[in-house]
Amino acid sequence: MTREERIRAAIAGRETDRVPVAAWMHLSEHDQDPISLAEAEVELTEKYDFDYIKMMPFGLYSTQDFGNQVKIYCDPYKEPIVQKFAIDGPAGYDSIRAISALQGTYGKQVEFARELAKRRIEGTP
């Protein structure tokens, strides 16, 4: 069975040649560069023959563009931490403005998704 066939069969409750498997972790040493992260995730998937790729972007990407000050280590053993929150009380919510999904930290995740789609082995969901 291919990876995709295995997953589709498992979801449908049909027999598979083996249990579909995947594992994921934050790849902090790569997650500030969309291309490096896409390459590392594909490499991890192929090394362990995982059946699908679970995207693991920078964990605080959804907050940084709104003003959170984040300490980034790029170290697999240190996760990023928020040093200062953008909102420190109820009135702070009035300062939230819409941002472009194609720029900033969020935009890097969109680029990561595009790069991952280009680099993944065909048939790997």
Located regions from the model:
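Catalytic cores of TIM-barrel enzymes
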Residues: 1-125
